[in-house]
Amino acid sequence: MPISLLSKENNSLKLIVGNYPLELVNSIRRASILYVPVMAVDEVYFIENNSPLYDEILAHRLAMIPFSSDEALDHYRPPEECAECKENCDGCYARVYLDVGANEGETVMVYSRDLKTDDPAIVPISGNIPIVLLGPKQKVTLEARLRLGYGKEHIKFSPVSIAVVRYYPHVEVKGNCEKAFEVCPEGVFGMENGKLFVKNEVACTLCEECIKYCENNIFISAVENKYILEIESVGSLKPERILIEAGKSLLRKLNQLKKLVEGL
């Protein structure tokens, strides 16, 4: 199989990709970072803020909170139409509201769960993200607008925390060397009856730390035309959706190039 599943968790996906050019696999990785849109706070209107944080700092914190974006991709207009929208912006924005205060003699930590949105499909991915600590008689009241955006605009619009392509490793043990078991940072090797063996080959990152101590007993190489693609989502989208949308973005760019060349 050219593509097979290595592992899958809630927000993480690892694929083994074979017989595809490295350039193509890396393009999908880059597109996952830069060209898959997600919802994020774009503008904040402060009504009241006497908290310890300036408006700009508080707005930045709000912008970096990931929001669920799966349904937004299907129902909101794309970034190309909304990034600089001044008129006829229907379908561009969702709104979020915050109105929290502390009474006399108390302190209140404001969390992402205190944000109220006008679209139930667009909510913070976690309600436990701290925003600001309010002291006695301090209050924050604001309204913010969210829109779809690309990671190339700002990292707040990037759906991934990790997007990595690495070579698929091949590890071969030619002789016994217990030191490799001790120094390998990835747990590639195991020991059984005093003998070294390869326990988890795919975990090898080709760092060659083991070879420093066991130069003639261990051989490490990268398998030709075989790679490991790892995607970890921040939670706005499932990793599978990120890869699908990354592929779509590449196809759109290729179609744009085709039209440009045909028009020459």
UniProtKB/Swiss-Prot annotation:
The protein's Enzyme Commission number: 2.7.7.6
Protein's UniProt keywords contain rRNA-binding: no
Cellular-component GO terms for this entry: cytoplasm; DNA-directed RNA polymerase complex
Pfam families: RNA_pol_A_bac, RNA_pol_L
Catalytic activity annotation: RNA(n) + a ribonucleoside 5'-triphosphate = RNA(n+1) + diphosphate
GO molecular function list: 3 iron, 4 sulfur cluster binding; DNA binding; DNA-directed RNA polymerase activity; metal ion binding; protein dimerization activity
InterPro entries assigned: 4Fe4S_Fe_S_CS, DNA-dir_RNA_pol_30-40kDasu_CS, DNA-dir_RNA_pol_insert, DNA-dir_RNA_pol_RpoA/D/Rpb3, RBP11-like, RNAP_Rpo3/Rpb3/RPAC1, RNApol_insert_sf, Rpo3/RPB3_RNA_Pol_subunit
Protein name (Swiss-Prot/TrEMBL): DNA-directed RNA polymerase subunit Rpo3
Species the sequence originates in: Sulfurisphaera tokodaii (strain DSM 16993 / JCM 10545 / NBRC 100140 / 7) (Sulfolobus tokodaii)
